[in-house]
A protein has these predicted regions:
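Conserved acetyl-CoA-binding loop-helix of GNAT-fold acetyltransferases
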Residues: 48, 54-67, 92, 96
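Acetyl-CoA-dependent GNAT
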Residues: 1-44, 104
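Residue-level signal for alpha-helix termini/capping positions
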Residues: 70-71
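Conserved acetyl-CoA-binding loop of GNAT-fold acetyltransferases
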Residues: 94-104
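Short coil/turn motifs at secondary-structure junctions
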Residues: 29-31, 51, 84-86
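Residue-level recognition of the GNAT/N-acetyltransferase active site
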Residues: 44, 49, 82
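Conserved beta-strand-loop-alpha-helix junction that forms the acyl-donor binding cleft
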Residues: 78-91, 110
């Protein structure tokens, strides 16, 4: 399921899988800003129920999020990864799916779409 909301200054897209065991959200600003670093949009809140992890749900949700971003004109998408708060398999997942660190000091990972 995909829900799209257009706000005053951004588009927000919520994607949930068919079984309602995972979801992801995208924020696309409607103005030129450096708020997202070098990305045109930001993925946040990618979540999969603990009992359904490592079954491909997160990858499908991430691919759908990237597809929706492309449909809305996004060329570069980013997400924040906090080493102190997340397991290392999460970082490996994003790197495997084409995300690269913006720089050594930043928690921002980016991907060209």
């Amino acid at each position: 399921m995909i829900q799209k909301q257009t706000w005053k200054d951004e588009i927000r897209i919520l994607i949930t899988d068919e079984e309602h065991i995972g979801s992801v959200q995208i924020s696309i600003p409607l103005y030129v800003s450096d708020i997202f670093g070098k990305a045109d949009a930001l993925i946040y809140a990618l979540f999969v129920d603990y009992n359904h992890r490592r079954c491909g749900v997160a990858k499908r949700l991430l691919q759908q999020a990237e597809q929706q971003a492309k449909l809305n004109g996004v060329k570069t998408i980013g997400l924040e990864f906090h080493k102190e708060e997340s397991d290392t398999f999460v970082l490996k997942f994003y790197l495997k799916n084409g995300y690269k660190p913006f720089n050594k000091e930043s928690d921002l990972l980016i991907k060209k779409l």
